[in-house]
Amino acid sequence: MFDGAPDLEFRAATKALELEHSALSYQRVPPGYRFPYGHTHRQQEEVYVVVRGGGRMKIDDEVIELEEWDAVRVPPCTWRGYEAGPDGLEILVIGAPTLDMRGDVDGERGWWPE
């Protein structure tokens, strides 16, 4: 469970792998579920890799379709959010540099209202 998103499965691997300069997480989003808020990082760049399923991702004002094995780079200071399609969405998220999440991230509930 991720803070504020009880339907999202979130597994962080950064500490378990003792990563010093990057971060890694796995996220499983149930079918039709939209992450409840958008977020941005002040310094961290992220790459989202779809490992199963599909859906859509909103990057600033652009909405893109996601399919299995798509990879999307999101630079710092860019708002992002995602939603699962009918088969759900499983993603790996790689971020660099590793930062204190509380000090680097801003979030906004309802950022992608559609």
Residue spans for each PLM region:
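A short, N-terminal "cap"/entry segment at the start of jelly-roll beta-barrel domains
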Residues: 1-23, 30-31, 36-37, 102-114
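Short, conserved beta-strand element in jelly-roll/cupin
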Residues: 26-29, 40-58
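A generic "binding-loop/recognition-motif" signal
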Residues: 43, 62, 78, 87-88, ...
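Short glycine-/acidic-enriched loop or helix-start segments at secondary-structure transitions
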Residues: 60, 68, 83-84, 103-104
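Short acidic-glycine-tyrosine-enriched beta hairpin
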Residues: 61-77
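A short hydrophobic beta-strand segment most commonly corresponding to one strand
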Residues: 73, 86-103
